[in-house]
Amino acid sequence: SDINEHIPTLIRYGQECEHITEMGVRGIYSTWAFLAAAPKKLISYDLEDPSNWGGNINDVYETAESYGLNFEFIKANVLEIEIEETDFLFLDTWHVYEQVRDELKLHSHKVKKYIGFHDIVSWGERGETEGYKGINYAIDEFLENNNEWQIKEKFLNNNGLLIIERIK
């Protein structure tokens, strides 16, 4: 998958969290990583059903249930919802400046520990849609304007992964 090399990192951060919010599910690869971290609650959002990408969300529900974990998949536009307070927010939706800027503006105040961003290399400078700026502009702008957040870890392999942490 386009994220497989980051699975151990996602599990590691997930293990420090009781509540994880994932935005952008696609084929549920990162969802499995977060479930493996065994948080008390995992909520995953996407505009489309994971079956469109070959993922079976029912498998996730069954696995979560068998381990006593609270999992919920919500089909929604993440710019039109209000999330629960969460320890880790993972963003992997539409990889353009405006989308990530708005996701951060809407949801970052609900995040207690970490925000993760996938595809900082593949869609960092140039957005995934022609004519749009990449996500790194939104991340840099957010960090510049919110000094309670700082970069924790950055990986350039497998499309790139960035973890920022709340420091106050």
Regions found by a protein language model. Give the residues of each.
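S-adenosylmethionine/decaboxylated-SAM
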Residues: 2-168
